[in-house]
């Protein structure tokens, strides 16, 4: 069973993304944030990824195409993400919240992503006014 990684298009550039259900948030390297042209400062906060502490100071709106599917969500800019099982650098760590929002289901045994429930329309339900 391998980790699921995919080539992702962000702003016309190709980046390597790893899909990690153990990570709540999505993280991107500085080069990816540059490609989004949407960096914004955030209140500094700490996070530990892979046993290594990081300080988050920026976020961006990640607009990407993955296997032909368009997604967008917020992502934190981070200084390092490590490498995949083949030693290739990881540029984007796709977290559980993004996968839930876009109904992306990782199938690790087959090293694939299931897009069966990818939304073409968002249905929002609002309670009736009082």
How should these model regions be labeled?
Residues 1-130:
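Pepsin/retropepsin-fold aspartyl endopeptidases
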């Amino acid at each position: 069973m391998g980790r699921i990684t995919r080539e992702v298009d962000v702003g016309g550039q190709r980046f390597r993304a790893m899909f990690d259900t153990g990570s709540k948030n999505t993280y991107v390297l500085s080069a990816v944030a540059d490609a989004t042209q949407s960096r914004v400062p955030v209140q500094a906060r700490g996070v530990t990824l892979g046993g290594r502490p990081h300080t988050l100071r920026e976020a961006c709106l990640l607009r990407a195409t993955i296997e032909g599917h368009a997604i967008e969500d917020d992502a934190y800019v981070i200084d390092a993400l490590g490498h995949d099982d083949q030693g290739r650098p990881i540029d984007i760590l796709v977290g559980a919240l993004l996968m839930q929002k876009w109904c992306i289901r990782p199938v690790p045994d087959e090293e694939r992503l299931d897009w069966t429930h990818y939304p073409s329309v968002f249905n929002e339900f609002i309670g009736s006014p009082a």
